[in-house]
Amino acid sequence: MYSANRSHRAETRNRSKDELRKVINSLEKVRRWEKKLVLIKDTNIRIYKWVPVSAQNIMAPPKIKEVKEVDEESNQVPSAENSQDSTSVTQPPPQFDINEDSNFSTGDHFDSDSNQTFEPQNYQGGATGSTDFSSMRDAEMTSKQP
């Protein structure tokens, strides 16, 4: 009798797991995905990520804000993309290319932490063969001996 109860419990667990899998799979089939520019927490890094379309975006029509005159000082150009409300998704400033390297700077300032220089480097390195350290080894040996 004890073993019958165990098999009965296992059967109900498996059945509930199967039902849960069916529900999840049916939701995944109808879920819509879109690629959005997402700001990573605690950084200024923005990456494209596939995110599910929220029900609010599907149901609510996009809010169109009144187009104002663009000042010369303004960095943002009013458009349908910039007027949509988004909590975790941000649009990049228009002066930056989306595919640019994050270490690239368009400013005329010099990064003091950078080890790069603007002067040409006259490196005359040759990869003609293996490096010979025998002269350095001989000099070391003679300096160690009194």
Curated annotation (Swiss-Prot):
Family annotation (Pfam families): BCL_N (PF04714)
Q: In which tissues is it expressed?
A: Ubiquitous.
Q: Where is this region: Disordered?
A: 59-146
Extract the signal peptide range: none
GO-annotated cellular components: nucleus
Knocked-out gene: effects:
Animals are sterile producing no oocytes, display a protruding vulva phenotype past the young adult stage of development, and have disrupted or no alae formation. Fewer seam cells in larval stages post the L1 larval stage of development and impaired seam cell differentiation with large and irregularly shaped nuclei in seam cell-derived hyp7 cells. Defective gonadal growth and proliferation whereby gonads are thin and shortened probably due to decreased mitosis, and abnormal germ cell nuclei which are irregularly shaped and enlargened.
| Record keywords | Apoptosis, Differentiation, Nucleus, Wnt signaling pathway
Compartments it resides in: Nucleus
Gene Ontology biological process terms from the UniProt entry: apoptotic process; cell differentiation; Wnt signaling pathway
Q: Where is the composition biased (Polar residues)?
A: 75-90, 113-134
Which residue windows does the record flag with biased composition (Basic and acidic residues)?
135-146
Question: What InterPro entries does the record point to?
Answer: BCL7 (IPR006804)
Question: What does the protein in this record do?
Answer: Required for the terminal differentiation of seam cells, and the differentiation of distal tip cells important for normal somatic gonad and germ cell development. Plays a role in the Wnt signaling pathway, regulating the expression of beta-catenin homologs wrm-1, bar-1 and sys-1, and the localization of wrm-1 and the wnt signaling pathway component pop-1 during asymmetric cell division of seam cells and the Z-cell lineage of the somatic gonad, respectively. May have a pro-apoptotic role, possibly linked to the negative regulation of expression of anti-apoptotic factor ced-9.
Family named by the database record: Belongs to the BCL7 family.
Protein name, please? BCL7-like protein
- Record organism: Caenorhabditis elegans
